[in-house]
């Protein structure tokens, strides 16, 4: 039937399989792993069939350093693709660094970055003391919607204005001079 049962297999070289590999235990790789597919199906699935209310499935990015230090980057998720010149690009990146590794006072910063005009740029930065949008000072607008108002809060990145309400009902210049309009 083509089935072979082995208790221990030690392979020094490559294994090429054209079928399904069933592993009922843990998989440990010391040199990394690459999972690829030639179609648009899910490349990796983490499935939990547990019926309780606890979290799961879990994806853990674990930086197990023997000498952790302040400002260590502990994990990065890159969303990569190709441009029209067949070059690999990072379209978006999420990364975390630990600002303070002191026991009991640990702090971390989360960055969310996207590609903007050929450069990966900061969109959201969450530090231990603040949340910053557009930390790289790009000409980007920021908008908050309500159920009935498209521009309930609008920050005009190119003109350095903050608007509250629809359009320009209330405008304040962020350079120090405040312009107020009631509409």
Which positions does each model-derived feature cover?
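Intrinsic low-complexity, repeat-rich intrinsically disordered segments enriched
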Residues: 1-72, 80, 85, 98-100, ...
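Amphipathic hydrophobic-ligand
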Residues: 86-93
């Amino acid at each position: 039937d083509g089935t072979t049962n082995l208790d221990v297999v030690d392979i020094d070289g490559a294994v090429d399989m054209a079928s399904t590999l069933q592993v009922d235990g843990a998989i440990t790789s010391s040199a990394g792993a690459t999972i690829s597919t030639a179609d648009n199906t899910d490349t990796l699935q983490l499935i939990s069939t547990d019926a309780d209310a606890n979290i799961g499935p879990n994806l853990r990015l674990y930086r197990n350093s023997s000498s952790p230090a302040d400002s260590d980057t502990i994990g990065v998720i890159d969303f990569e693709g190709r441009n029209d010149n067949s070059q690999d690009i990072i379209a978006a990146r999420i990364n975390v660094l630990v600002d303070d590794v002191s026991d009991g006072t640990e702090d971390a910063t989360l960055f969310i970055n996207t590609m903007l005009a050929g450069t990966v740029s900061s969109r959201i930065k969450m530090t231990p003391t603040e949340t910053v949008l557009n930390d790289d000072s790009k000409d980007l607008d920021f908008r908050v919607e309500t159920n009935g108002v498209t521009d309930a809060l609008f920050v005009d990145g190119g003109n350095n204005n903050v608007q509250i309400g629809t359009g320009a009902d209330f405008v304040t210049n962020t350079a120090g001079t405040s312009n107020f309009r009631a509409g």
